[in-house]
Structures are given as C-alpha cells and as structure tokens.
Amino acid sequence: MANKLRHIAISVRDPEATAKFFEQAFGMTRAGNAQRGVYMTDGIMNVALLNFGDEPIAGMEGQKNVTGLIHFGMWVDSVEQVDKAITAAGGSYVTGRKETGPNVYYEVKYKTPEGIVFDVTESGWKGAVKEVAPKAKAAA
C-alpha cells in the first residue's frame, strides 16, 4: 500500500450550512459529527468542516477568525517511517502522537518547510477509504 491523501480540514463559520452546500453542490454525504462540526465524504475523501471559534488551531496559533484550508491529511502505512521521511525532507513536528489501541483514532501534525500544516495517521478518517479498487473496463 502507499501513502494516500484522504483528508482535508476547512475552517468555516457555519458547519451545518457549509455541509448542506457540499451535499447540494457536490453530492457529498455526511460521514459523522466532529467535535467542532461535520465530516463529509465523497466515498473516498474525508472533508472536515470545522468551526474553531476562539480556540487555537494547531500550527496557526495566534491567528484569529481563520477560515479556509486548515490542513490536509495523509493516510500512511507507518507513522514511524513517514516521520523519518518528513524530517529528512525538511518538515517539522507540531503536535500529536501515535496511539497504541487498535480502535483509537489519532493523528500526528507536522509543517512543511513553508509552514503548511498537515497530519498523518495509520487509522484514517470517517468516510475515507485508503485503497480504491480500479473500475473494471467495459467490454469492447
């Protein structure tokens, strides 16, 4: 298996209204509730629509009323291996740690050399699918 982009977090003022927009405009469905909003899915990707209010956002401390892309997430085979690759490529650790329980969700956050925040996990996100089977070709 390979590392896969499977998560995007967006800071929005009204998660419910934004979720309805994603449903109507893109045909996405709700994958579940988040602590600060709603998880949406297209069947492969997870899009978290979150209202952080006045709470600090990991990697964006000190910024107020942030809207837009907060971070992206990579579903990886091994957090330990990708940690080494991230560090070797110039990335830096922000927060989080790998959990040991099989049914425990976790993510570890990093920054790219330019300061773009992203997270990695081996456990995935609600509504996301790591491996996608290719569609069978129609008979000619």
Per-range role (PLM):
Residues 1-19, 69-74, 123-140:
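N-terminal beta-strand motif that seeds the catalytic metal site of vicinal oxygen chelate
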Residues 4-13, 41, 60-140, ...:
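Vicinal oxygen chelate
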Residues 23, 48, 73-75, 79-80, ...:
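A general secondary-structure boundary signal
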Residues 45-49, 56-58, 115-118:
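Short, charged/polar, Gly/Pro-enriched secondary-structure boundary elements
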